[in-house]
Amino acid sequence: VVSAYLEFFGEGASALTLSDRATISNMAPEFGATAAMFYIDDQTLRYLRLTGRDESLVKLVETYAKQTGLWADQLAKAEYERVLEFDLSTVVRNIAGPSNPHKRVATTDLASQGISGTVEATPGLMPDGAVIIAAITSCTNTNNPRNMVAAGLLARNANRLGLTRKPWVKSSLAPGSKAVALYLEEAALMPELEKLGFGVVAFACTTCNGMSGALDPVIQKEIIDRDLYATAVLSGNRNFDGRIHPYAKQAFLASPPLVVAYAIAGTIRFDIEKDSFGQTPDGKPIRLADLWPSDEEIDAVIAKSVKPEQFRSVYEPMFKVRLDSGEKVSPLYEWRPKSTYIRRPPYWEGALAGERTMRGMRPLAVLGDNITTDHLSPSNAILLDSAAGEYLAKMGLPEEDFNSYATHRGDHLTAQRATFANPKLLNEMVKKDGKVVQGSLARVEPEGNIMRMWEAIETYMNRKQPLIIIAGADYGQGSSRDWAAKGVRLAGVEAIVAEGFERIHRTNLVGMGVLPLEFLPGTTRLTLGIDGTETFDVIGDRTPRAQLTLVIHRKNGQSEKVPVLCRLDTAEECSIYEAGGVLQRFAQDFLESKAA
């Protein structure tokens, strides 16, 4: 389904609530689709009424859909290029991980998949696989009433049986809407969640995007001192290596009620379906089945406690007209040279405004498959010993105010230091005893010196050395993070040659003036024996999906010509690229319109 437009239909789809449909559709990037759609039907109208829309709007939606042929009944005979069947009756509880959202594991198979095992705990110490972060988070799961009510009911059941969250677990609740907190309060479930440590920390993007905040210093020290295998469990969309927290070596995605259960278990080694959470007063083991609420109970709570007025009270004030009677603001921003949050951007000056040579490019990195935007530009907490941390300290910020990479995206001097700053990066140019060394590392050529990635970037920037990146399949998957393209462009990368690109990231590369090139089938960095000592030229006319020539100049003086596919897919993309990127193109169009 990669790059496909999906439309769900059938008996199962018609029975899904709109909240469940939205949860599925919001995961479209994770299963690689361009879009995931459901038809308009009575479930749609029911949701509009539940969320407080005016009856006139509900009627308009129904009338418009029926008049335009978009109503479910009129799509019953629609023909599709491909039809994939999925039986909803086969759905069971799952988690996803480690490291990728598509690594689905049924909770009944945790032991056979090597995730759960013997829980080896020493009194006073965290166990192997300790869950250091348990977060009910993400715009996807927290806007689904069934998921949130299920989490609240599981918390209530756990509290009644005397279960508690393990002390090393940092737990949080970040609903995607204030309406969620209102209906949890209405159902008397918010106090139950708070009792287990799941109080509301924000109505915003938090742990899912690597912004969980700092760990308890004592817990952090133990993780470092013992080199502990620590994990995170969250109800987010993505769990790529290094994304959630620098000290969570791996992360697992789970539903909100499972997140609560893992906070009580305290370790990913716990077999969540089979192991005992504790004992009842009469000595009976407490298992997940004893905590999990029934569908009937969830439905009853939703019917009683989720009300239209909750949504109206949250959203109606957002659309009220307000007149600002304050001081007039200058139309031009007054740049502050000491700011680490917003700084005058460099995209229209210096090397970024100059012509890309496509000659003599040296590899900044040679990478494998499935490189994510979290590898390219992480968004999580900034550590003191990182390049960005050292820069912020030099700017006078105390460590507790470093915040996350995501919050400093308006300051290119901070944000560009995030380029390849993921400690889980595997740059095949950096090896020890024949094995690739994990870390934010690079090898500067022609000297062959291994150093931190940012120092290598600075070295090449000072030399005005044009750069290239060589990669495997699915380059740039994950969040559509603009800095994953901005960072490499600021570093001096002119082209990226990969076996394949994630759709949105390829578009972002074009928008930043970085040329995406694709190896032809059967050709890879491995078949070409690329080790990073080479220099590269790109020859040919850059037209939509043209075949260009990648010239590889070997260290021994030999050269090799390799055909590659130009992934400027349209004439418009070619125009944007040749202008230097979308920002330069915008500036050109603006100046031309002013001159006209």
Task: Describe each model-derived feature in a short phrase.
Residues 247-255, 259, 266-268, 272-370, ...:
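Extended hydrophobic packing segments that form well-structured cores
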Residues 18-40, 99, 132-150, 203-208, ...:
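Conserved phosphate/anionic-ligand binding catalytic regions in large, soluble enzymes, centered on
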Residues 9-11, 19, 31-34, 38-41, ...:
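Generic beta-strand/beta-sheet core signal
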Residues 1-62, 71, 149, 155-170, ...:
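Mobile "lid/hinge" segments at catalytic clefts and subdomain interfaces of large enzymes
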Residues 192, 199, 215-225, 234-235, ...:
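Hydrophobic alpha-helical bundle architecture
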Residues 84-188, 192, 323-497:
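Non-catalytic terminal/interface segments that mediate subunit docking, oligomerization
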Residues 280-294, 505-576:
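Acidic, glycine-rich flexible loop/linker segments
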Residues 3-7, 34-37, 83-85, 130-132, ...:
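Structural motif
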